[in-house]
Amino acid sequence: MKTILFLMSVLLFFSFNILKLSAQINDYFTPLPKSIPVIKNNPITPQKIDLGKKLYFDPRLSASGVISCNTCHNLSVSGDDNLPTSVGHGWAKGDRNAPTVYNAVFNVAQFWDGRAEDLKEQAKGPIQEAVEMHSNPALVVKTLKSMPEYVSLFEKAFPESTDALSFNNITKAIEAFEATLLTPSSKFDKYLEGDETSLTENEKKGLDLFIEKGCADCHGGINIGGEDYYPFGVVEKPGAEILPPDDKGRFSVTQTASDEYVFRASPLRNVAITAPYFHSGQVWDLGQAVMIMGNSQLGEEISNNEALLITTFLHTLSGERPKIALPILPTREKDTPKPQI
């Protein structure tokens, strides 16, 4: 009888903990949708997506004619370039690590400091940034208008516009394509949808630690992050290599003292393949990144074993990347600017 009572108590204990974890999971996380979300002020159409795809891969949006969106946000790998900071115009290096474009449509805003409200606003930045594509709206529009096929594609994608091939419509088309770059059906998504067998015991232990330690307080929602802004170094600031003192994050946008060293929480979907980590791009090991966040944000000394379990869970956030065929780009004409290297 004592044995039976003991086994029943053990069963009840584990059942209670499973129910408790399930309740916490539903509070923190949402499965990634498999369909394109509704985009504010930019109804998505097949014509816009097709045009946006061409623009995304076309290096002629840059002043040099050799840098495309895909250069720094490579869809063949992880939607970024796996470099500490991106290499742009004239081999110049940017100041921050390039975030992945996959699932970026679900972020509260774009860029580490949230200076772009949405993807169409974000697309304007790199095109005009001196160390990235080094171009300007007038040059980009002139370049694309030199190719009749682009003119026709814009007229089909924006039939309501009197001047279809405009800089605003260029960025709207890019946004339409980027909104399709979703990576659903990760192991964790399946778990969120009710498949208890999709995660191993160690992955579940890692998830439990992720919640218990407080990681999920900043990294939750659809994108497991990307929903709000937080100071980097709540408890203890990391070293200058990881948190450069001259990069004050969101302060550069708001000029509000309380926003110094505040950054958008990094979305963790596909984090296992998006190294290096942090806005400085100086940490290559995911376990090390977990330990740094434990010290800096939570005041927690995360052990090697705990970091291993948490990273085991983080690997379950890798979803199915879309299969994307390279587009055939419009042919250059005699008035199309030549590449400048």
How should these model regions be labeled?
Residues L19-I341:
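Periplasmic c-type cytochrome electron-transfer domains
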Residues M1-Q24:
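Bacterial Sec-dependent N-terminal signal peptides
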